[in-house]
Regions:
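Intrinsically disordered, metal-sensing/regulatory segments
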Residues: 1-258
């Protein structure tokens, strides 16, 4: 039950954020979008460092001076994995007119949902690999530290859910369809978490690689999508300030609960 709730919490965060479309106006002010993107980026960077990369290095201490090796290898595999998906899957970022990925005849709203779905894959994997480490009896990953990551991801999923559902509504979708599209984009987190737990149980020695893999994938999303989004236009410093807020919050959660 503890693990089930842990992997469900981020999805709940997404769903609550998506629900904003049911009672808010169709669009968010640009300053609000930048603030939300900055906050999400801060949480993801802190989670990648404190919850994923540092534990990956600590679990490889038996390798001595080469303890960094699993973290570096896993990190790069994660980056390349997301880079590959980014090129293969047609998607459209919120606020952009130009689609990315392979050429497709998919509609704008479908490609917007796919963009957020891509974003959610590494988040689900990150939560899954933490709970996999806890299940494996890894002394450096506790139920509290896994919960801290789950809560952090859920907190940043709330504004993320609003960021996707409101533009879908602005594109002409009904409130119901905009809500459903946002929720579906979050389902991939549940799937990613479950599959990662299963994979990690089968190859427990690979846990440091899986931790850093999730970190690499998350940081790819931050640099490729969130940092540009939080830095565009006037008053871009609001994105930087909220990045610091998100980073601090995730760091506090990890240290206080972990």
């Amino acid at each position: 039950m503890e693990i089930f709730l842990g992997i469900l919490i981020p999805f709940i965060g997404t769903t609550l954020g998506v629900a904003c479309v049911l009672f808010m106006k169709k669009t968010l002010r640009k300053q609000v979008q930048r603030a939300l993107a900055g906050f999400a980026a801060g949480v993801m960077v802190a989670a990648s460092i404190w919850s994923l990369l540092i534990p990956a290095i600590e679990q490889s201490e038996n390798m001595g001076a080469l303890s960094f090796f699993p973290a570096v290898v896993g990190f790069w595999i994660g980056v390349l994995f997301l880079l590959t998906l980014d090129h293969l899957i047609p998607h459209l970022h919120v606020g952009s007119e130009q689609s990315e990925g392979s050429k497709s005849k998919l509609g704008r709203t479908t490609m917007m949902v796919l963009a957020v779905t891509l974003h959610n894959i590494p988040e689900g994997m990150a939560v899954g690999v933490m709970y996999a480490g806890f299940l494996a009896g890894n002394t450096q990953i506790t139920a509290a530290s896994a919960l801290a990551l789950s809560l952090g991801i859920a907190i940043q999923n709330f504004p993320e859910g609003a960021i996707i559902s409101l533009p879908l509504r602005a594109e002409g979708e009904s409130k119901g369809k905009a809500f459903l599209g946002g929720v579906l984009s979050g389902v991939v987190e549940l799937v990613g978490a479950v599959l990662t737990i299963i994979a990690a149980q089968l190859i427990i020695p690979a846990l440091p690689y899986l931790l850093s893999f999730a970190a690499g994938a998350m940081l790819y999303v931050v640099v490729e999508e969130l940092i540009p989004e939080m830095s565009q236009g006037e008053n871009s410093n609001i994105g930087t300030v909220f990045f610091a807020v998100g980073f601090s919050l995730m760091m506090v959660l990890d240290v206080a609960l972990g």
